């Protein structure tokens, strides 16, 4: 399973998929 803090858009270590992943990555980048 994956926790929120594990989410990543890294293809090799991808924990999340699709829109949720993209939104989370944008949130991190904007911080």
Swiss-Prot record:
Output a single Gene Ontology CC term carried by this record. Answer: extracellular region
Keyword set for this entry?
Answer: Amidation, Disulfide bond, Ion channel impairing toxin, Knottin, Neurotoxin, Potassium channel impairing toxin, Secreted, Toxin, Voltage-gated potassium channel impairing toxin
Does the entry annotate any disulfide bonds, and if so which pairs? 2-16, 9-21, 15-25
Tell me the domain of life. Eukaryota
As annotated in Swiss-Prot or TrEMBL, what is the tissue specificity of this protein? Expressed by the venom gland.
| A GO MF term | potassium channel regulator activity
Any Pfam family the entry gives: Toxin_12
Methionine amide found at: 31
Q: Does the keyword Secreted apply?
A: yes
**Compartments, record wording:** Secreted
Q: What is known of its domains?
A: The presence of a 'disulfide through disulfide knot' structurally defines this protein as a knottin.
What more does the entry say?
The primary structure of this mature peptide is identical to that of kappa-theraphotoxin-Gr2a (GsMTx-2) from Grammostola rosea (AC P60273).
The job of this chain, per UniProt, is described as: Potent and specific blocker of Kv4.2/KCND2 (IC(50)=34 nM) and Kv4.3/KCND3 (IC(50)=71 nM) potassium channels. Acts by altering the gating properties of these channels.
Similarity comment text for this entry: Belongs to the neurotoxin 30 (phrixotoxin) family.
Q: What is this protein called?
A: Kappa-theraphotoxin-Ps1b
Q: Which organism is it from?
A: Paraphysa scrofa (Chilean copper tarantula)
């Amino acid at each position: 399973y994956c926790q929120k803090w594990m989410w990543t858009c890294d293809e090799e270590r991808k924990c999340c998929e699709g829109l949720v992943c993209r939104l989370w990555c944008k949130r991190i980048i904007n911080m």
